[in-house]
Each structure stands twice: as C-alpha cells, then as structure tokens.
C-alpha cells in the first residue's frame, strides 16, 4: 500500500552560478518540477519548492580567472540573473537562495563536523596532479587533455563534453594544466572520504528492492553503480574557493562541491523557515522529491542519501524524477561553445511568451530518451497547437457568447445524446491528468489537457451554433454553455503547465480562483455569469522570427568553427621531380556557364595562351558564372582529360577550401599573359 504523506518537499538541482540558465536546464529540471508543485498547490496540498544557486566549484573559479575578477563577482552576477530569469519564466520557488550565504556555510560546516565526530569519514593520502608553475593542486576541471574514449581534445578531468563520458584526471591522455598550460606532476595530498562502500548494503535494499517504481534511467544507473561496487569518495579538495574544511590541519582545503551543494537544499529551507525547517527534512510524514538531470542521478540517489543516513536524523528521498538530455538543432547543448537557447535572451526576444516555451519543452520533454529542440518545431507547436487548437477554441466560444448573449453565460436546455457524450468525455479528464502527473509523466499529462481543447473544437464544428442562431437560440445557448464549461475546465487543467495563459483566461472568464477538485465539472460557470472581453490567448509566430533565431545559432556555429580552426596536417613529403611533373598555368576565362542538371558544376572556356580549352569545375555553389568571366585563374594544364556530365574537362581549376567549406579560386595578383607557368 502506498504511504500517505502530510507534506512534500520538492527540490530542483541547483544551477551553477557560472553562466545563465538554458533550455536544457528548463526541460530537464525546472519546468517539470514547477508543473508538479503547481499541481500539488492546486490540490491544496502542503508543499515547499526549494531552489538556489550552486556557487562553489571549479567552473566558477575558472571563469573568474578568465575574466580577471573574483569568484564572488562571478556568482553575484549570475545568481541574480538566474533568479530574475526564473521569476519572469514563472518557476514558482518558495525560496531561491545561494550556497555562499551565511546560513549555508554554517549548516554545511556543522553537517561535516557531525559526520566527522561520528567517525563517518576516512582520511587518505593520495597522489593528485599539481601545477609546479602555479604552485597549486589541480582540481578536475583545471586539467584538460585528450578523451580516452572519443579522442577529442579539451576534455576535462571529470567529464568529456564531446561524448559525455565521466572521467578521472588520470584518464586523460597528455594532460595539461588549465592555469599555466604546463604538464602537471603527481604530488601527495591528504583528504577526507565518505566510504560509500560501507553504505552499499542498505543502499542496495533501499533502491533496488524498495524503489522499483523509480524511472528506468534512474533505477538502471543506480543498479549499474551498485553492481560495480561503491568506492570511497573524497569530500574535500585543494582549493581556495568554497567552504573551508572545519577541522585542524585542513588549511587550503574546502568541502567538495558535490558534498556542499545538496546541503544547500536544507540551508535554503532553513533560511526561509528558521523555526520549522526540520519538519520539512526530518519528519517521516514528509515526502522528499529531487528533480534533476541524468548527470546528477548518482549524487542524489547514492551519495546524498548516504550523507543523510550517516548524519542520522534526516529523511531519504521518496522519488528522484530525472530526465535525459535535451539537444539543440541536432547538437549537444554546450555552455562553453555558447550552443544554447539562453532563458534570459528568450524572455527578451519573446516577451509574454513564457508559456509557449513551457508548452514546447513539456511536449518534447526528454523523459525517457534524449530529445531535440528545433526552432521549426517550436513554431509548429505554437501555431498548430496553442493557436489553432487551444486558442482557437477559447476564442470561438468567447466571441460567439459575446455576439449572441452579451458575454453572459447562457442557460443549458435539454441535452442531446451528442451533448451528453461530450460532457462525459471531459468529465474524465481530472482522473486521467492526475494519474499521469502522480507518476511524473508530464508530457502525456499535458497532451491529455490539450485533448480537452480538441474535444471543444470538434464539438463546435459539429454543432455549428452560428447556423442555428436564426432559428433556435435555445439550442445555441446550450451549445455555448457546454463550450464555456469546457473553456473553464481548460483554464484549470492547464494551470500547472501554462500558468500565464490560465491566469489570462481566468480573468477573461471572470473567475476568482481555480481549484483542482473542480476539474471535470460542467457547472463551473453559472447561468448569467458575466464574462469579460475576449482576447487572443496565443498569437502566430511568423517565419521571420524563427529565421532570426536560426541565424543566431548559425552565427554561433560559425564563430565556434573560426575559434577552433586548425589547418589539415601537411601531407608526406614528395620529391622535387614529382612536383615538376605538374604543369600549373594561368588562363583567362572567356566564357562560363552552369552545367544543366548539375548543381555544383560550372563549364569554362579558357584561353591557355596556345588555344582555347574546356574545363569543368565544381564551384557553382560559390560563384555566379558572370562574376568569373574575364578573370584569370590558376589551373593544372597537363591533367588527363576526364568526362563530367558528358563534357570532356581538359584540366583542373585550383581553389582553396575555407574551414566553413566555401571555395575561393586561386587568381594571380597581377594580370599576366595567358599560359604563364606557375613556378
């Protein structure tokens, strides 16, 4: 039998305050968490939604070093940007604090000391990379090198961003310091470790036997770790940014960010509720839920629970809904490559359209596998679903009521069989949406809510009240009453998903408030109830708007290619005699035309100083024929003739290929006689 809880504590992964929030963060963590919290609030359940910025860790110190500022400067800037963006986007945290707060430093230090005094840590001396030039130990993100799996350059000591593989610094091929660029050496250092192997027995029972209902990706990743055997994990590291390890002999060492950050959920709760925070973290009648991305599964399902269990007074998570990753236009989202749709920029570019992004990210949520966000899909879902289905039905029902009944809810007369069938269809929506939300299937739940609008559109299309207005106003009133009840139900059903639109619709309907318990009823709007003026809930997004966003990404891709450009390696040496076999000359282009049925080919007539020759070249995508006529080009004159599209080509025009794939024909700087040799 499922346990009943008195209250629910919901946490969402703390975003790193070293950059803005992007759509991958939203789709993976914050939108689903917010949907669930809003759903519980509508049900009048006791729920607390905890958020905050993770402000320690190496990525922050690296950014500070690059920018020539302090780590505090970096986290201050991004904490406030992230917090403001979440507020504008409607992520309804009860508290959004930070891990540089005094409350957090005190609580995290006390947590460490409790475990230390209970003998829950082991001390180990190990060898770690050390930068002799900078005279500092190197944390994992301060070491880069070649990934041993995909062999891409620039992999970090904890993860390869290219293939996503988790790494240790010693896994890297040809490691180097991100501080000085020098090759690091191994040097001894002492740290404290949480012996996860000591907790393996109860973790195996708790996860593999007691929580088989967890999502397959969560359960599977945990099982994989447990089957491999858990190892002690360092809880301290050599850094000067973070919470100092609160024991003697720990100078120059701070709490490892994975140990420090999840305690932030607790300290943020304490900051909000200094007198009652323990109820939300220590009472067995409180349900604890962590919303995270798949890269955080192990920390929230194995490491943090082991910390809580070792402390002894905390509850453990009841569920850890974790999503897979969201990609962008077929490529992995990357902060370092600026390959992302940033939330603060979206809010500027699409004012008043928070719900469009919330809808699209939920409709395409990576709940069971990695999914892809494309701007074309964003536009299609807005125009074909939000505008054409939901918005269209609401507008028709409201405008027809305004036209025929002065925006007052008409009476419902005798019901036809079709009316009864329609009412029965939407009476079941509450149970269906609830069933899906209770098991964190947000994508399907939103689809079920949208189905209400489809029912409404079909009902209006089938009954055609505008045709009955001249002969049977009683029937028109019944049709519009049923339609308006559907509209009111839509406002409630979509409130967790599209809060801004539901609020707008609530005002149009002149309703004071929503309650989840009312969903599915057909008497939400009493007869004679005065409606307000109808407005469009959503508006079409034009092609030009989407093209601008796509162009922004193309510009980013081009900038990345420019920044990462490396010329191809030089080919093996050849003998001078081999080179002299090539007869490279300058010719003047007399004629140029496109080759029929060949997108890439141009046909040239070239004066080579001796005669006129024909050459076919694959540069049609890079030049128009008319811009080349009269120009001089370099070509190989003694290449054996070959037939291309039925045309005999008597040579090869030389071009240079740029890093973006574009071609530039090689031309002499000064005009020379046709047939001049290139030496």
Curated annotation (Swiss-Prot):
tRNA-binding domain ranges (all copies): 578-679
Report what the protein is called. Answer: Methionine--tRNA ligase
The UniProt note on the cofactor reads as follows: Binds 1 zinc ion per subunit.
* Uppermost EC category: ligase
- Keyword set, alphabetical order: Aminoacyl-tRNA synthetase, ATP-binding, Cytoplasm, Ligase, Metal-binding, Nucleotide-binding, Protein biosynthesis, RNA-binding, tRNA-binding, Zinc
Recorded hits in NCBIfam families, A to Z, give: metG, metG_C_term, PRK00133.1
Question: Is Zinc given among the entry's keywords?
Answer: yes
Q: How does it assemble?
A: Homodimer.
* EC nos: 6.1.1.10
Q: Source taxonomy lineage?
A: Bacteria, Pseudomonadati, Bacteroidota, Bacteroidia, Bacteroidales
Q: Where does Zn(2+) bind?
A: 147, 150, 160, 163
Q: Which residues bind ATP?
A: 335
Q: Does the keyword Oxidoreductase apply?
A: no
Q: What reaction does this enzyme carry out catalytically?
A: tRNA(Met) + L-methionine + ATP = L-methionyl-tRNA(Met) + AMP + diphosphate
> What are its cofactors?
Zn(2+)
Species the sequence originates in:
Bacteroides thetaiotaomicron (strain ATCC 29148 / DSM 2079 / JCM 5827 / CCUG 10774 / NCTC 10582 / VPI-5482 / E50)
Subcellular location field:
Cytoplasm
Q: Which family does it belong to?
A: Belongs to the class-I aminoacyl-tRNA synthetase family. MetG type 1 subfamily.
What PROSITE patterns does its record include? Answer: AA_TRNA_LIGASE_I, TRBD
User: Motif 'KMSKS' region, which positions?
Assistant: 332-336
What SUPFAM superfamilies does the record point to? Anticodon-binding domain of a subclass of class I aminoacyl-tRNA synthetases, Methionyl-tRNA synthetase (MetRS), Zn-domain, Nucleic acid-binding proteins, Nucleotidylyl transferase
In terms of PANTHER family, this protein maps to: METHIONINE--TRNA LIGASE, METHIONINE--TRNA LIGASE, CYTOPLASMIC
């Amino acid at each position: 039998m499922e346990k009943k809880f008195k209250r629910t504590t919901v946490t969402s992964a703390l975003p790193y305050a070293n950059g803005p929030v992007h759509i991958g963060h939203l789709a993976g963590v914050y939108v689903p968490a917010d949907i669930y919290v809003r759903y519980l609030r509508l049900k009048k359940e006791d729920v607390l939604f905890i958020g905050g910025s993770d402000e320690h860790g190496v990525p922050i110190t690296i950014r500070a070093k690059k920018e020539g500022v302090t780590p505090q400067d970096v986290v201050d800037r991004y904490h406030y940007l992230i917090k403001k963006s979440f507020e504008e986007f409607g992520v309804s945290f009860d508290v959004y604090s930070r891990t540089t707060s005094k409350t957090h430093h005190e609580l995290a230090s006390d947590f460490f000391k409790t475990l230390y005094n209970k003998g829950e840590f082991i001390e180990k001396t190990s060898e770690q990379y050390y930068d002799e030039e900078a005279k500092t130990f190197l944390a994992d993100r301060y070491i880069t090198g070649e990934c041993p799996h995909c062999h891409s350059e620039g992999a970090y000591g904890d993860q390869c961003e290219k293939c996503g593989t988790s790494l240790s610094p010693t896994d890297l091929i040809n490691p180097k310091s991100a501080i000085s660029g020098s090759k690091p050496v191994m040097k001894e250092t002492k740290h404290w470790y949480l012996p996860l192997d000591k907790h393996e027995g109860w973790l195996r029972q708790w996860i593999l036997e007691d929580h088989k209902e967890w999502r397959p990706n969560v359960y599977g990743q945990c099982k994989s770790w447990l089957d491999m055997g858990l190892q002690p994990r360092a809880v301290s590291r050599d850094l000067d940014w973070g919470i100092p390890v609160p024991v003697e002999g720990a100078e120059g060492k701070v709490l490892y960010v994975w140990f420090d950050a999840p305690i932030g959920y607790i300290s943020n709760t304490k900051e909000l509720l200094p007198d009652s925070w323990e109820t939300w973290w220590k009472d067995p009648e409180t349900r604890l839920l962590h919303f995270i991305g798949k890269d955080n599964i192990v920390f929230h399902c194995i490491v943090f629970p082991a910390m809580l269990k070792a402390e002894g007074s905390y509850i453990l998570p009841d569920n850890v809904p974790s999503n897979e990753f969201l990609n962008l236009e077929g490529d992995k989202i990357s902060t370092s490559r600026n390959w992302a749709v940033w939330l603060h920029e979206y809010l500027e570019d699409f004012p008043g359209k928070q719900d469009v992004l919330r809808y699209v990210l939920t409709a395409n949520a990576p709940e069971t596998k990695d999914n892809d966000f494309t701007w074309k899909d964003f536009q299609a879902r807005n125009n074909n679903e939000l505008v054409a289905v939901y918005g269209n039905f609401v507008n028709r029902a409201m405008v027809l009521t305004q036209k025929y009944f002065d925006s007052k809810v008409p009476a419902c007369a005798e019901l036809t069989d079709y009316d009864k069938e329609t009412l029965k269809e939407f009476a079941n929506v509450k149970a269906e949406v609830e069933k899906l939300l209770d098991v964190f299937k947000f994508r399907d739940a939103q689809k079920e809510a949208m189905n209400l609008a489809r029912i409404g559109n079909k009902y209006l299309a089938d009954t055609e009240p505008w045709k009955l207005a001249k002969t049977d106003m009683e029937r028109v009133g019944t049709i519009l009453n049923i339609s308006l009840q559907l509209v009111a139900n839509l406002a409630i059903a979509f409130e967790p998903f599209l809060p801004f639109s539901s609020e707008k619709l609530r005002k149009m309907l002149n309703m004071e408030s929503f309650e989840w318990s009312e969903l599915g009823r057909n008497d939400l709007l009493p007869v004679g109830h005065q409606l307000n003026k109808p407005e469009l809930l959503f508006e079409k997004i034009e092609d030009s708007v989407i093209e601008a966003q796509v162009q922004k990404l193309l510009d980013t891709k081009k900038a990345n290619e420019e920044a990462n450009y490396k010329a191809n390696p030089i080919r093996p040496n050849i003998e001078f005699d081999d080179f002299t076999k090539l007869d490279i000359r300058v010719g003047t282009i007399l004629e140029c035309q496109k080759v029929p049925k060949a997108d890439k080919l141009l046909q040239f007539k070239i004066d080579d100083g001796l005669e006129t020759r024909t050459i076919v070249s694959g540069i049609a995508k890079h030049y128009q024929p008319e811009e080349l006529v009269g120009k001089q080009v370099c070509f190989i004159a003694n290449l054996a003739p070959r037939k291309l599209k039925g045309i005999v080509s008597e040579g090869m025009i030389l071009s240079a290929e740029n890093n973006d794939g574009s071609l530039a024909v090689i031309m002499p700087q000064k005009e020379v006689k046709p047939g001049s040799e290139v030496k």
